[in-house]
Amino acid sequence: MVRMRRRRACSSGGACGCAAVRGARSFLSVRVLGMRIGMSALCLAPLFARTASLGAWSSQGGEVLGEVRARVPAHRRVRRAVSGTSVTPVVAMAAKTSEKQKGVGRRALSLRTGGRYEMLGLAFTALADDASFFEANAAGSAAFPYLLVGGFHFARVNQSHTDTIALVHSIGRTGYGFSASVQYPYLTMEGKAVGGVAIFNVAHRFLSAYRFKGISVGTNVKVGYRDSSAGGERNKKNQGGKKHVVVTADIGLQGTWSVAKNFGSHEPNLWVGGTVKNVGLSVEVDASNSGSSMSGGRTVHATNSSFILACAYQPIRWFLFGTGIEWKYNVQEFADNNRFRYGVAFLLLPVQYVAFGSNVFLTGLASDIRASAGVEFKSTWVRVDLTYTYESDKDEHVISCGIAGFFNRDRRKHLEKEVYTSYLRGLRHYDAQHYEEAIAEWRRTLQRAGSFEPAREGIERATKLLQLNRQVYDFHFLH
């Protein structure tokens, strides 16, 4: 009986004690950011206060914090607040948003167009044999001996579109071109930037020969305009209502050779290219609306630039492969804006009029992958291509298509026919041991094409044999 009474007393006393503890906890609890937190979580109050001040300092950060809290149920918010796991991701998201805001002023407005550039990626910096060469290698126009007119459409699914027209021509070893691109949002999307860029190109080829096809040097001058406030009030808050005029320049270098070629063709099969892209300035034209907090009081920014090295090789007629590496940097923020990208590509040409291409490249050591696959149809006068691209870092799907027409090809073919016909006539004279006639014919070949090395080599050999025959004749005449 005594033990039972003691137990009842203890149980009743314990109930009173529990009630007292609950009351104390209720008395010591506080409300932070709309959530009631007990005394076990009071040590997190400075972190919440810091997050709240960050949201007050940046309206963008405040919106992000509100969206994150709205997505998480109330019981999970309390549990995460007590455990202390909800603060760090939110602060990181707010900081990332602020960094994205600052990055608007550094963009160089390099609009992806499509064509072989989209199909082959970084390796196309070495080839640069399509109307999409403007953003790949400024030296590409020197390799076009005909008039090329192209049009491209580049679409990020449910996001934005880019339309491009390009014109390329050459006079002798000097090429020139013009490209204009316009970017606009998807019809049902808001908050997307609009803009456009015009590119003026000139390039020249040096040391062109029969086996060594020469070195080309070219430059681009780009003038662009971007309006990040075209998507409505919501986008003005996110991007600061910024409008920029961007002026940049590119310098490109390309070398081409015929090396270890296992098929008959007069075109090169080894390409090496390098380029420095988007060296210039981005000028904010509505700085009064954005304030100094967006760009540290500066309205002029150095654009993000790139340095690319690439090579491509075609050992056999139906297969081409290439690789490239890109270094992206910003001269004003070199320590924080400095990364590498690298990739590989291949092109299959099973028949004369159809080609299949693909490329994959990665950014640094991250798992972000961009992969493309495309098909190309070509004839004597036109080339059509279609490419699909997937970007894992943004989870975006991209479709691009293009068409290009070749004009004044008859002039080139007529000249090639005259050169080879003249060279073959010289070979017939050479085979008949009529060396003087062969030399005269090959000199006429060089008048049509001064870089045709077989004719020059034939003249050297025929001259040596002619001198040898004269020495033999003189020897027999004297004896």
Swiss-Prot record:
Keywords recorded for this protein, A-Z: Signal
Signal sequence range: 1-49
Any one Pfam family match given in the protein's UniProt record, by short name: UPF0164
Annotated InterPro entries: UPF0164
Domain of life: Bacteria
Family note: Belongs to the UPF0164 family.
Record's protein name: UPF0164 protein TP_0865
Organism encoding this protein: Treponema pallidum (strain Nichols)
Taxonomic lineage of the native organism: Bacteria, Pseudomonadati, Spirochaetota, Spirochaetia, Spirochaetales
